[in-house]
Swiss-Prot record:
UniProt xrefs under Gene3D superfamilies: 2.40.280.10
A GO-annotated cellular component: cytosol
Predominant location: cytoplasm
Biological process, per Gene Ontology: trans-translation
Main function: Required for rescue of stalled ribosomes mediated by trans-translation. Binds to transfer-messenger RNA (tmRNA), required for stable association of tmRNA with ribosomes. tmRNA and SmpB together mimic tRNA shape, replacing the anticodon stem-loop with SmpB. tmRNA is encoded by the ssrA gene; the 2 termini fold to resemble tRNA(Ala) and it encodes a 'tag peptide', a short internal open reading frame. During trans-translation Ala-aminoacylated tmRNA acts like a tRNA, entering the A-site of stalled ribosomes, displacing the stalled mRNA.
Keywords: Cytoplasm, RNA-binding
GO MF term list: RNA binding
Compartment(s) where it occurs, according to its Swiss-Prot or TrEMBL record: Cytoplasm
Keyword Cytoplasm tagged: yes
Family of the protein in this entry: Belongs to the SmpB family.
Protein's organism: Enterobacter sp. (strain 638)
Pfam families in UniProt: SmpB
Protein known as: SsrA-binding protein
Name of the coding gene: smpB
CDD domains membership: SmpB
Length: 160
């Protein structure tokens, strides 16, 4: 009988795109797999990924992740050229691709990468259909966030 693998404590999140939530209204989220090369998986295991400027584009019925930066490790393969910002194919089923294509065709919508994380042994990216925020929307979100912090502080001191 084989032993069960012990789950290692810690976060499965590799990278977050905090700027996306600040600059866009996220209307719908999808989980997609990534087609990666060996050196990219090693870099992700080391946590050397940045998705702050990444977005998704659809070409010929397939989805691709642009602008994601996976920094190669110093010990990566020497006989293979490592391109840190290469275009990576997203693995989605046909229904999800058609849904994304229909939403992107509407004016003002885009698809951005929200987070990069491990799910079991597979690397997944959470993408979101987004619409850009205006400056006044960003200000109102900031005021709401500050009010929530103040409210929590008031409630904490009210019980004393």
């Amino acid at each position: 009988m084989t032993k069960k693998k012990v789950h290692k404590p810690g976060s499965a999140t590799i990278a977050l795109n905090k700027r996306a939530r600040h600059e866009y209204f996220i209307e719908e989220e999808f989980e997609a797999g990534l087609s990666l090369q060996g050196w990219e998986v090693k870099s992700l295991r080391a946590g050397k990924a940045n998705i702050s400027d990444s977005y998704v584009i659809l070409i010929d019925g397939e989805a691709f992740l642009f602008g994601a930066n996976f920094t190669p490790l110093a010990v990566a393969s020497s006989h293979y050229v490592c391109d840190p910002i290469r275009t990576r194919k997203l693995l989605l089923n046909q229904r999800e691709l058609e849904s994304l294509f229909g939403r992107i065709n509407r004016e003002g919508y885009t698809v951005v990468a929200l987070s990069l994380y491990w799910k079991n042994a597979w690397c997944k990216v959470k993408i979101g259909v987004a619409k850009g925020k205006k400056q006044h929307d960003k200000r109102s979100d900031l005021k709401d966030r500050e009010w929530q912090v103040d409210k929590a502080r008031i409630m904490k001191h009210a019980g004393r």
